[in-house]
Amino acid sequence: MATATLMPSNGKVLSTKDGTVVFSPAGTNYEMHLNSPAFAGPLDSPVKGIVRVKPKKIWTVPSGGLFISPIFGPPKTIQGRIRSLDEEQMVIHAGGSIVVELPEDANLYDLANGPLRVGAMVNVTAFRGATFEMVR
């Protein structure tokens, strides 16, 4: 399986303040507020980066669109298709690639629509504190 570093999100960092960047994935209107205390890259220019979230809950869902909510602010709900999966993380395509750490607690999964697998549609509710790491 491809690792998260081989599936970065393309987009632009629109601004940075107090260790937080505003990242807009290419082809979207999203403006995700992400922790990135060490960011020293360009503003408003194309960049590649890894967006990471820690889940409160992961569901497999039968259908639906690819989205990140809210459109402006820290990502709270992410729904998309699994592009890559291993025992520690999965990469979801949802208007950009989002790396989701897989929790050990089985109570955090609701797999009513089948197991986690590449190509499956999932919905993730994320904790605050999503991060951005630029890939050079």
Residue ranges and their predicted role:
Residues N10-K12, G41-I58, P115-R136:
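Flexible glycine-rich surface loops and low-complexity tracts that mediate binding to linear polymers
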Residues T20, Q89, M121:
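Exposed beta-strand and adjacent loop surfaces of beta-rich binding modules
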Residues V22-P25, M90-A94:
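SH3/SH3-like beta-barrel fold
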Residues A26-P42, S97-V118:
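Beta-strand/loop nucleic-acid-binding surfaces
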